[in-house]
From Swiss-Prot:
It comes from the Bacteria. One of its GO terms (cellular component) is pilus. Residues 1-24 form the signal peptide. This is Putative fimbrium tip subunit Fim1F.
C-alpha cells in the first residue's frame, strides 16, 4: 500500500527571507520580463498507521512533517533553470488548508528565457537537505551521468518519523504575462515503514508477554532518486543502519534490489536474543508492513504483512 501520505497539502506561496534560491541564466539572454512566480500544491499520500489527524487513515503527524524542501525546475530538455531550498523557518507551522494539513510557499522569479509558452518540469525532494545546505545545489540536469539528480545518492538514514524523505515531480506549461495555475506535485515516501507487533500464540492469537525487540540491523540508509524512470527498483545504493534497543518498534528502510541483503530482527525472550532474517528486497518504497510472530509449542513462525498491497508507480518526465 502506498505511503501515500493522503492529501497532505503544501501550497507554495512564499514566506520569504532566509530560503535559498537560484535562477540559472544562459549567457546572451536578456533577463528582463522573462520570469514567472510559481505556486505549488504538494500532495502527500497516506502511510498507514492510526493517526490523531482525522483526515488521514494511518499516517501520524510526524510522518507527514516536512522540515526542509528542495525544489528544482527544468526546461523541456531536462536542464535545470531554477532551484530553491526551504527550511523550517521558511516553511512555518503546518496549517490546515481546506480540510488537510500543509504549508504555504512560493517560487519567485523562475526564468524561462522567452515570452512564448514554456513547458517545464518540477522536482521536489523533501527532508533530504542538510542543516544549512542542500546536496542538490550544484547539480545541473535532471538525468545524466554527472551532476544530475538521477545520479545523486541520498546518504541519509530515515531514522526519525519527522525526517522521512519524500519525493515527487510534475509537469506544467507556463504562460507569459498571465496568472499561472498552481502546480500540483504528488509526494511519496521514499522509504518503507515497518512495524514490529509482537509474538502471539498461534492457536488463539493471544499476545505473549516476555518477548521484546532488542535490535534491527540491515536497514538501508541510502537511496538514489531515480524512481521516476521506471516502477522497478533502481536505487543501487546500500548503507547499513541498525536500530539500538532505545528505538521504538516502528522503523524505516529505503528500498534495495539486492536479493542477498537481509533485515534482521533480534528478539529476546530469555537470556540471549535470537536473530530472525527477512529478505530486504521485500520492503518497497511507499508501503507499510507489519511483522509478527506466531508461536507454536516448538518454534516461532514469522508473518510479514503488507497492510494494503498497492504498487507504487510514478511516470517519467516527458
Amino acid at each position: 500500500m502506498r505511503f501515500n501520505v493522503v492529501l497532505f497539502m503544501l501550497i507554495v506561496a512564499l514566506l520569504g527571507g532566509l530560503s535559498t534560491c537560484s535562477s540559472e541564466v544562459p549567457i546572451g539572454f536578456d533577463t528582463d520580463e522573462l520570469s514567472f512566480d510559481m505556486s505549488l500544491v504538494l500532495l502527500t499520500g497516506d502511510m498507514q498507521t492510526k493517526a490523531s489527524d482525522p483526515n488521514y487513515t494511518y499516517a501520524t503527524t510526524e510522518e507527514l512533517t516536512i522540515q526542509n524542501c528542495h525544489v528544482a525546475v527544468f526546461d523541456k530538455d531536462g536542464k535545470r533553470i531554477y532551484f530553491k531550498n526551504f527550511y523550517s523557518k521558511d516553511l512555518g507551522e503546518m496549517k490546515t488548508i481546506g480540510n488537510l494539513s500543509g504549508y504555504e510557499l512560493q517560487l519567485e522569479g523562475v526564468r524561462t528565457f522567452g515570452k512564448e509558452d514554456k513547458k517545464v518540469s518540477v522536482l521536489v525532494v523533501a527532508n533530504a537537505n542538510n542543516a544549512n545546505n542542500s546536496p542538490f545545489d550544484n547539480l545541473t540536469t535532471y538525468d545524466g551521468v554527472d551532476n544530475s539528480y538521477t545520479a545523486k545518492t541520498i546518504a541519509k538514514g530515515p531514522v526519525t518519523a519527522s525526517l522521512l524523505v519524500k519525493i515527487g515531480k510534475s509537469e506544467t506549461t507556463l504562460k507569459y504575462n498571465q496568472d499561472n495555475a498552481p502546480v500540483t506535485v504528488s509526494l511519496i515516501q521514499l522509504s518503507a515503514k515497518i512495524e514490529y507487533t509482537g509474538v502471539y500464540k498461534k492457536e488463539n492469537g493471544e499476545l505473549l508477554e516476555g518477548f521484546s525487540l532488542t535490535k534491527v540491523a540491515g536497514l538501508n540508509a541510502s537511496s538514489k532518486i531515480t524512481i521516476f524512470n521506471t516502477s522497478a527498483v533502481e536505487n543501487g545504493a546500500f548503507s547499513d543502519l541498525a536500530y539500538p534497543t532505545t528505538k521504538p518498534v516502528t522503523f524505516y528502510t529505503y528500498e534495495i534490489s539486492d536479493a542477498f541483503k537481509e533485515v534482521i530482527l533480534s528478539v529476546q525472550s530469555g537470556v540471549e536474543p535470537k536473530e530472525y532474517p527477512f529478505p530486504a528486497n521485500k520492503f518497497i518504497k511507499g508501503n507499510y508492513y507489519r511483522i509478527k510472530g506466531l508461536k507454536s509449542s516448538t518454534e516461532i513462525e514469522w508473518v510479514l504483512e503488507n497492510v494494503e498491497d498497492k504498487e507504487v508507480t510514478l511516470d517519467p518526465f516527458e
